[in-house]
C-alpha cells in the first residue's frame, strides 16, 4: 500500500468523510492525492513524492505560493517576538493604517477572528444603517 493510500485510510477512519473541509474530501476529487506533505512556489508534493501544480492555492490563502521568501522571513521575525497576545500589538495598528491608505473610503479597519464573526458584524452594521430586519443570504462556506 502506498503512503498516500495509507493516509487516505487513516483520514477515513479518524475524520468523517476523510476531511474536515468538504471541498478537500476525496469524494469530490478521487484522482487527487489524499495528503499533501510539502509545498514550494505553486507546486505541492504528496506522501509518495509525486509533484503537482496547486491550482487550488490552498483554497485561497496562498496567493504568493508556498514558502514565499518575504512571507517566511516575516513569520520567522514574528515568531521570535511571540504570537497571539491578549493585548494589541503594533503590527495590528500598522496593518489597519495601511488598509486605510490603500482603500480610499476606509476610515478605520477592524480585525475579527473568523469569517463567521466578520459576516455577523457586517449584517449588524447593514441592519443598523438601513433600518431593515431581513437579510437574504446564499453562498459557499468551505
Question: Regions from the language model: what does each represent?
Answer:
Residues 15-16, 45-47, 70-71:
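Short, flexible segments with low predicted structural confidence
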Residues 138-142:
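Substrate-binding/gating loop at the entrance of the active-site cleft, primarily
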Residues 29, 41, 60-61:
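Short active-site-proximal "capping" loops at secondary-structure junctions
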Residues 34-54:
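Active-site and channel-lining beta-strand-loop segments
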Residues 2-10, 45-50, 100-101:
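Short, hydrophobic/aliphatic alpha-helical segments
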Residues 20, 40-41, 64-69:
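Short capping/connector residues at structural and topological boundaries
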Residues 51-134:
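Glycine-rich loop-to-alpha-helix module at the N-terminal edge of alpha/beta enzyme cores
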Residues 1-38:
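Active-site-adjacent loop/helix segments that line or gate small-molecule/cofactor pockets in enzymes
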Amino acid at each position: 500500500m502506498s503512503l498516500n493510500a495509507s493516509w487516505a485510510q487513516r483520514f477515513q477512519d479518524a475524520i468523517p468523510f476523510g476531511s474536515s473541509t468538504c471541498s478537500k474530501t476525496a469524494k469530490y476529487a478521487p484522482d487527487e492525492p489524499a495528503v499533501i506533505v510539502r509545498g514550494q512556489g505553486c507546486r505541492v508534493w504528496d506522501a509518495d513524492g509525486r509533484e503537482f501544480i496547486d491550482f487550488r492555492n490552498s483554497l485561497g490563502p496562498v496567493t504568493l505560493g508556498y514558502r514565499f521568501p518575504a512571507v517566511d522571513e516575516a513569520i520567522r521575525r514574528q515568531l521570535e517576538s511571540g504570537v497571539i497576545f491578549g493585548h494589541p500589538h503594533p503590527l495590528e495598528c500598522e496593518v489597519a493604517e495601511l488598509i486605510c491608505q490603500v482603500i480610499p473610503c476606509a476610515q478605520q479597519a477592524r480585525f475579527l477572528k473568523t469569517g463567521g464573526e466578520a459576516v455577523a458584524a457586517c449584517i449588524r452594521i447593514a441592519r443598523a444603517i438601513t433600518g431593515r430586519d431581513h437579510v437574504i443570504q446564499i453562498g459557499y462556506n468551505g
